[in-house]
Amino acid sequence: MNPHEIARFWEKVIKGPGPSACWLWVGAIGDDGYGRFWTQTTDGGQRMLRAHRAAAEIIYGVKAITDQLVTHLCDNPLCVRAENSREGHLLIGTHAENMIEREYRGRGNLHNPLWKHQGRAARATSARLLRAHTLAYGYDQHQVDELVRGIIMPGQQPLF
């Protein structure tokens, strides 16, 4: 990516406060709930990247992520927190490593109440609601937890 594209990318990110907060993508969102970012190709065309993959490319470099998956430790499809430290939320790895991590965190059980409501359309709707809320009111960890990760605190009233 060129410097203009990198600057344009970071203009679409709202960083949550604190060392463990997500950095939320507030640009385009695809029908799967993941952010979308377009860059120019060398032949004058365009290529579309998922926003978290674009963040990993910016921080780690194209070679580091070629033929690898970029996955989320935070389970937030809008998170683009790529860092060269333990605070980063994105991991680079293989499909097999991602499946092991998925099982370890209990995401492999499709009957788990935390994940069973999160089909493709529901995930996209939640992501768009979180983007709208963040743009209107700023970063809100409770909304990240409820809308994207499906975590509802005891006694918490619904947003809508």
Please provide the spans of the model-predicted regions.
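Short, cationic Gly/His-enriched loop motifs
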Residues: R47-F160
